Amino acid sequence: MGRIGTPVFLAFLSALTCSLQVHAQVRDLKQCSNDPEFGRYCPTTCGVADVLSKYAKGVDEDSSFIDSVLTQLAAKHGIVEGNVNIVNEDVRITRDEAQIIKDSGQKTVQKILEEVRILEQIGVSHDAQIQELSEMWRVNQQFVTRLQQQLVDIRQTCSRSCQDTTANKISPITGKDCQQVVDNGGKDSGLYYIKPLKAKQPFLVFCEIENGNGWTVIQHRHDGSVNFTRDWVSYREGFGYLAPTLTTEFWLGNEKIHLLTGQQAYRLRIDLTDWENTHRYADYGHFKLTPESDEYRLFYSMYLDGDAGNAFDGFDFGDDPQDKFYTTHLGMLFSTPERDNDKYEGSCAEQDGSGWWMNRCHAGHLNGKYYFGGNYRKTDVEFPYDDGIIWATWHDRWYSLKMTTMKLLPMGRDLSGHGGQQQSKGNSRGDN
């Protein structure tokens, strides 16, 4: 489609302008001008009509073209506007996704920081566990070393006496206790059968014979080879091993001890040995156990003598003004881990892992846990209480003794041959 040239379009605009001006003047004068110059500089109406007629077709074509262009522009504008909306939506979505990513990133960072904190706590906990395990390993190594030495000693002993049997070492001499065995001709320490007056059948015991006195041994600790964490029935019937020499560990049994001490008055001697191989003892008069119906209650009339001190009478540990009262053993019932007869709101026997005449709890405990070397600490025990073999009037409660022996002799026997160790009754610590 052709377009109006620029000169023609300008001439058209000039003529139109002049015509409008003349029309305005004629309107103002309300009459036509007869001026002969009229139309010289400004085309007349007829001239304008000619020009319009001449270029009207081109103007119409250009107008149509312009309309077409405008229509196309409008369409393109709609497309552009749609694209802009799409872009805006994409921007919004992108912003939302960016916010989500930001939030997720913050959560991830927080999670990582929390995991780092947890790992730090685990690290601290592991350090403490490593230290604890290291200490346990050290203690176990010491224990293994001692066991290895004991194994060597046992093998050496076996190599010397493997031909001997317990059966061949039991003497045929018998009696109601070891003193009667001596009275009936027994001369050497060893294994004998005795039958207390009310016993239904005889039972085997170790008799320690010295200077004409026959001691009936009811308990012995020697090397930790026997576990003293036992129940009520085991302590009632007895456990451990009897040997021709006093080199094994055992508990004779509460029922047997009751039968023995119920037939006459007996002296109880407690022999103690520490890890420096120092020996001390404590003697009690008229020692006896009541029957099982009374929970094998412990009785004695007095502390006779000894250089180990009277731990059965209790001891002031300095923890409580009533420590001595809480730790006396006179009149106490026998307790085992599963049969609690003590005066404590907890269970002394369960915490200590053994049977004994517990109060709340004890000052002397010869059935406690065996600790090699003597000294032990709170960190070595399951509960924060002393559970070793203790005699508080000699060594403190965190020292476990090496060897103990509990033995009975009828009251009234002459003990002048006991190394001149007759002493008056005392209550001071034996190691002061």
From Swiss-Prot:
Alphabetical list of InterPro entries matching this protein: FIB_ANG-like, Fibrinogen-like_C, Fibrinogen_a/b/g_C_1, Fibrinogen_a/b/g_C_dom, Fibrinogen_a/b/g_coil_dom, Fibrinogen_CS
Glycosylation sites: N227
Transmembrane region(s): none
Annotated GO CC locations: fibrinogen complex
CDD domains, A to Z: FReD
Any one GO BP annotation for this protein: protein polymerization
Protein name, UniProt field: Fibrinogen gamma chain
